[in-house]
Amino acid sequence: IHGRAAAIATGAKIANPNLTVWQVSGDGDGLAIGGNHFIHANRRNINLNMILLNNRIYGLTKGQYSPTSPRGFVSKSSPYGTVEDPFRPAELCFGARGHFFARAVATDAPGTVEILKAAYNHKGAAVCEILQNCVIFNNGTHDAVYSKEGRAKNAIYVEHGKPLIFGE
């Protein structure tokens, strides 16, 4: 049911409002073929938790570029580089009138747990983007934030009611 996870999760939640629903999609699955479902799940703002695993590539199709691949990205499906700018999942979420978006890096377990707990406690649609590496087809895609040192230098941690701190 490629691309239909958000639609199925929405139906499950509407059919059983007491059910806690978590939906998991990749960046290609969730934002390309499932992009319209992602948009409407956010617009409807039902109590649904969406996890978007973003490795900037279709790993299961062996290296096809995805909606989040950067402009110029060379792959089997774009041998001369992609010509489009990538989707920015947070902008897409908020553009659809979504109320909750959080991002974590797969190598930061405490940060990932924190955003998943926040999503669970949020009433309404919640999107958690988790940046992942694809060691086979897109190795190093999130290097700027994948290591602890990289996160200290390049990541911004946002906490409600607290100041933003840039850099170390």
Question: Where are the regions a protein language model picked out?
Answer:
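Thiamine diphosphate
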Residues: 1-59
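Conserved thiamine diphosphate
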Residues: 18, 66-119
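Accessory alpha-helical/coil subdomains and C-terminal extensions
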Residues: 121-122, 126
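Flexible, low-complexity linker and terminal segments
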Residues: 134-168
